[in-house]
């Protein structure tokens, strides 16, 4: 294979200007290939190439080494230079192209590799099993599903789609492009999936919020006696955290200790996150304190854990410990701190942390940080300040920011502002049923029934759908899910009879169903009461009372914010039945014990 002399001379003239500034001594060196390993910058690499040209070295292996250096830690300059070298070759081979593809897959504009890929295909160079992983990774990074599908078809034509290197990257490409079902089709075609393939599919499910499928596949993997590795554990732990599956999480912890995975900081951090999200804060603290080395992610996980459990002071003290040990905070650290302040009404402390994040640590606020600030202000009743904060943001506000404020308007019964906020939301997204429900509840609370009916019609015309309330509880290693309304029409099961009896006992202790929560003008109070009774969290708690020994903590995970009526009922349940109830909703944790909640009724 020959390299174009004219192109190399062009490179040389560009590189020669750097010679006098270089730290590389080439005077007594005979083999420039050996110099590449000593190279520290693109500038020095250019000088080595200049020396090689002066020495009449036109070896393809030398140029391949130059390209490898450029693509190892790609920048715009290094990839531009590598491409110049590649295109200067009269007969590049697939090995050198693979090096280019690896570089582009790590680059800010990964899809630039495809113009080069088309060129080599036109030259009759066929991709191999090392080509597809890099190209598919580029598609995954760029969320380029169509290009990924074309690569999948090409890999099938070449008989490489079931290759051990290609399969996992195909699965990853599809899941990163949010086509999890296609990823599963790829997985199911593998005759004997290896650990790497299982990891790719389990990770894909976990990242796309499909934890049940992730855990099901993990159990299948165990049934085939395949040993999970660090990547497996990280994905399974995140799935346990999403579901609130504490029993399985504890088993994973035992497995990690037995097989020495607890030496990995990432595994410990995932364990902290899992235990905290499953409601076992003490276990999370225990893991953290036993860690020999704690990085930013570990500290942040603990700060977030305390915040979500309403332990604002401990969250802030953890931050002080972190700084005293010279660990640099990141954006997650400050999300935890802002949430800690928000959940406990510490407005001024929250403002201070937000200011510090920008001015002292140089962290650019993300939409999540702005959302935390809106939550901080509005939850404390500073609704107009929150509205002004959103209006003056340096970026375009998203519906999420306005929705945070709308929820606070409901909590503080501010109908006028809620109407203004709803208009801003509907300008951006009018398909979210929950927005209509919140506004409708406010109208009902203020006896404006004509507006309730009108809004329900608008919601129907726009085909806006409300996400149904869903609560889950783990009993004997099985996660059981309940949806609001289950059993309203035919409450004949043992569970529903037990729920009816439980509500009777609650009423004897002073429980009064908050029928103002049910927005149906044509319903009488008894019908509204039945609707409240079959909220998903009440069903899950009742299931826990029926199926766990006396004294066992009942742990429930809900996909929405817990309503006021269920919150009041849970407090009484903890008192009457002597059970601690840990409820994780979309906002935070509620620890109910002896008739009280850890949130202090501030949520």
Curated annotation (Swiss-Prot):
Belongs to the PPR family. PCMP-H subfamily. This is Pentatricopeptide repeat-containing protein At2g02980, chloroplastic. Coiled coil: none annotated. One of its GO terms (biological process) is RNA modification. Residues 401-476 are annotated as: Type E motif. It comes from Arabidopsis thaliana. Residues 1-38 form a transit peptide. GO terms for molecular function: RNA binding; zinc ion binding. Disruption phenotype: No visible phenotype under normal growth conditions. GO terms for cellular component: chloroplast. It is found in: Plastid, Chloroplast. SUPFAM superfamilies: TPR-like (SSF48452). Involved in RNA editing event in chloroplasts. Required for the editing of a single site in ndhD transcript, which is a plastid-encoded subunits of the chloroplast NAD(P)H dehydrogenase (NDH) complex. Not essential for the activity of the NDH complex of the photosynthetic electron transport chain. Residues 508-603 are annotated as: Type DYW motif. The gene is PCMP-H26. PPR repeats lie at residues 93-127, 128-162, 163-193, 194-228, 229-263, 264-294, 295-329, 330-365, 366-400, 432-466. Pfam families: DYW_deaminase (PF14432), E_motif (PF20431), PPR (PF01535), PPR_2 (PF13041). The keyword Chloroplast applies.
């Amino acid at each position: 294979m020959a390299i174009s002399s004219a192109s190399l001379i062009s490179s040389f003239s560009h590189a020669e200007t750097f010679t006098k500034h270089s730290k590389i001594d080439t005077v007594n060196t005979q083999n420039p290939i050996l110099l590449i390993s000593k190279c520290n910058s693109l500038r020095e690499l250019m000088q080595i190439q200049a020396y090689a040209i002066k020495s009449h070295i036109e070896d393809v292996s030398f140029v391949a080494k130059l390209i490898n250096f450029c693509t190892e830690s790609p920048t715009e300059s290094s990839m531009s230079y590598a491409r110049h070298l590649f295109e200067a070759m009269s007969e590049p081979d697939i090995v050198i192209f693979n090096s280019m593809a690896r570089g582009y897959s790590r680059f800010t504009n990964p899809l630039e590799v495809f113009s080069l890929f088309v060129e080599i295909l036109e030259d009759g160079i066929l991709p191999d099993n090392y080509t597809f992983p890099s190209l598919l990774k580029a598609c995954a990074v760029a969320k380029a599903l169509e290009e990924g599908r074309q690569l999948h078809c090409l890999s099938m034509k070449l008989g490489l789609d079931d290759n051990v290197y290609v399969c996992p990257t195909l699965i990853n490409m599809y899941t990163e492009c949010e086509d999890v079902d296609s990823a599963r089709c790829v997985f199911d075609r593998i005759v004997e999936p290896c650990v790497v393939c299982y990891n790719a599919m389990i990770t894909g499910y976990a990242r796309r919020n499909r934890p049940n499928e992730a855990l099901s596949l993990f159990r299948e993997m165990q049934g085939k006696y395949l040993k999970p590795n660090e990547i497996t554990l990280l994905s399974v732990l995140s799935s346990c955290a999403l579901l609130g599956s504490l029993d399985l999480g504890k088993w994973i912890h035992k497995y990690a200790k037995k097989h020495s995975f607890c030496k990995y900081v990432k595994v410990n951090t995932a364990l902290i996150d899992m235990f905290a999200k499953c409601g076992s804060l003490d276990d999370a603290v225990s893991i953290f304190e036993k860690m020999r080395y704690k990085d930013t992610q570990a500290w942040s996980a603990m700060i977030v854990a305390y915040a979500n459990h309403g332990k604002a002071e401990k969250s802030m003290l953890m931050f002080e410990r972190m700084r005293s040990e010279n660990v640099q905070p990141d954006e997650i650290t400050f999300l935890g701190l802002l949430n800690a302040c928000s959940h406990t009404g510490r407005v001024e402390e929250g403002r201070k942390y937000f200011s510090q994040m920008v001015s002292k640590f140089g962290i650019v606020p993300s939409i999540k940080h702005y959302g935390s600030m809106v939550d901080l202000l509005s939850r404390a009743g500073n609704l107009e300040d929150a509205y002004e904060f959103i209006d003056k943001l340096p970026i375009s506000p998203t519906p999420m920011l306005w929705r945070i404020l709308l929820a606070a308007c409901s909590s503080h019964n501010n109908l006028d502002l809620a109407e203004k906020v709803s208009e801003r939301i509907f300008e951006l997204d009018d398909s979210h049923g929950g927005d209509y429900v919140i506004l409708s509840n406010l109208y009902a609370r203020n006896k404006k029934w004509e507006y309730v009916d009108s809004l329900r019609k608008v919601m129907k015309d726009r085909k806006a759908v409300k996400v149904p309330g869903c609560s889950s509880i783990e009993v004997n290693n099985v996660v059981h899910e309940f949806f609001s309304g289950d059993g309203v029409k035919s409450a004949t099961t043992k569970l529903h009879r037990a729920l009816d009896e439980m509500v009777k006992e609650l009423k004897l202790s002073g429980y009064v169903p908050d029928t103002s929560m049910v927005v149906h003008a044509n319903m009488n109070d008894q019908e509204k009461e039945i609707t409240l009774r079959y909220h998903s969290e009440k069903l899950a708690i009742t299931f826990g009372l029926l199926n766990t020994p006396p004294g066992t903590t009942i742990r429930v995970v809900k996909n929405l914010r817990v309503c006021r009526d269920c919150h009041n009922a849970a407090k009484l349940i903890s008192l009457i039945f002597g059970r601690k109830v840990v409820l994780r909703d979309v906002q935070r944790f509620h620890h109910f014990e002896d008739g009280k909640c850890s949130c202090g009724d501030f949520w």
